């Protein structure tokens, strides 16, 4: 006999009084997730069998389940394991902010008026917990290569130390000095030299 008329005979039917699917031994599957309703903790929401028929939680709603999401409380992308990616606009903002950081002449001491800029930079870095940030120091061509190299390294390190104090983990940052080797303007003019004395901050996601 087949009491529920689902083409699964009663002796083989795990749900003999409820029409169901042959593939599920005659039991129904309301949400179509392949888990029989009787075994499904979420019978009206599709979910994997390994989670008892319930969908994996996704706190930030970015489409990456919390179990696979490296940033479960920040909206991110599937390609970046659920973490936000550094967009071009954010990259530009970091560079624009970093270039306005001021130091005492010939020293690595950050001027007090740069603290607001650094606080803004720290806020940006905090939004990208799986991104590695490289802090670069650059100088103009005035003075010896050795002095410029050391000064650029010390300035990059000063910025990194400040950001560490603001709560950015040290392992997410590196500081490197390039001295006068990477000018972006003409060192033969006062304006060009001022432009070349700068800090840059670059962020790279692990899969880049």
Where do the protein language model's features map onto the residues?
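Periplasmic OmpA-like peptidoglycan-binding domain that tethers envelope proteins to the cell wall
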Residues: 107-116, 136-208
């Amino acid at each position: 006999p087949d009491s529920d008329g689902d083409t699964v005979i009663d002796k083989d039917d795990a749900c003999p009084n409820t029409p169901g699917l042959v593939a599920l031994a005659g039991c129904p599957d309301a949400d179509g997730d392949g888990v029989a309703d009787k075994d499904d903790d979420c019978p009206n929401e599709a979910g994997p069998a390994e989670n008892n028929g319930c969908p994996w939680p996704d706190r930030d709603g970015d489409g990456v389940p919390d179990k696979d999401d490296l940033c479960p409380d920040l909206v991110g992308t599937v390609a970046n394991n659920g973490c936000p990616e550094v967009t071009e606009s954010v990259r530009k903002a970091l560079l624009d902010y970093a270039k306005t950081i001021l130091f005492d002449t010939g020293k690595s001491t950050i001027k007090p008026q740069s603290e607001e800029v650094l606080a803004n930079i720290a806020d940006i870095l905090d939004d990208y917990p799986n991104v590695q940030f490289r802090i670069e120091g650059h100088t103009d061509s005035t003075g010896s290569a050795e002095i410029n190299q050391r000064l650029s390294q010390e300035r990059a390190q000063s910025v990194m130390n400040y950001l560490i104090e603001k709560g950015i983990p040290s392992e997410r940052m590196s500081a490197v000095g390039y001295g006068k080797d990477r000018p972006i303007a003409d060192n033969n003019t006062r304006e060009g030299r001022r432009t070349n004395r700068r800090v840059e901050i670059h962020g790279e996601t692990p899969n880049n």
